[in-house]
Amino acid sequence: MEANSRVMVRVLLLALVVQVTLSQHWSYGWLPGGKRSVGELEATIRMMGTGEVVSLPEEASAQTQERLRPYNVINDDSSHFDRKKRSPNK
């Protein structure tokens, strides 16, 4: 009896997994077959505008200048290596 119930639970679980994996995942604006409706695509293109470039306002603050200044990643000062004491090899 217990073996029959285990088999039944496994069959039901398999059926649920198959149903979920094969089902259509719907998203807003999508039609069956993965196609968008033409009306919504046209509305999206109209929202994007004419394709003009948007200019950013000029910032002349010190914070902006600091952010744009290149950083020196490699430190040319190797004096910290000279400070290490080397033990003589015996």
Swiss-Prot record:
GO molecular-function terms, A-Z: gonadotropin hormone-releasing hormone activity; gonadotropin-releasing hormone receptor binding
Sequence segments annotated as region (Disordered) = 56-90
Which key words tag this protein in UniProt?
Answer: Amidation, Cleavage on pair of basic residues, Hormone, Pyrrolidone carboxylic acid, Secreted, Signal
Keyword Secreted annotated:
yes
Q: Name the domain of life this protein comes from.
A: Eukaryota
Which GO cellular component terms, listed alphabetically, does the Swiss-Prot or TrEMBL entry include? extracellular space
Q: Does the keyword Phosphoprotein apply?
A: no
* Signal peptide range: 1-23
Question: What main location does UniProt list?
Answer: secreted
Subcellular location(s) of the protein: Secreted
- The Glycine amide modification is found at 33
Which Pfam family, just one, is annotated for this protein? GnRH
Question: According to the UniProt entry, which residues carry Pyrrolidone carboxylic acid?
Answer: 24
- Show the PROSITE patterns listed in the entry: GNRH (PS00473)
What is the recorded function of this protein according to its Swiss-Prot or TrEMBL entry?
Stimulates the secretion of gonadotropins.
Family membership = Belongs to the GnRH family.
Protein name listed in UniProt: Progonadoliberin-3
What is the gene name?
gnrh3
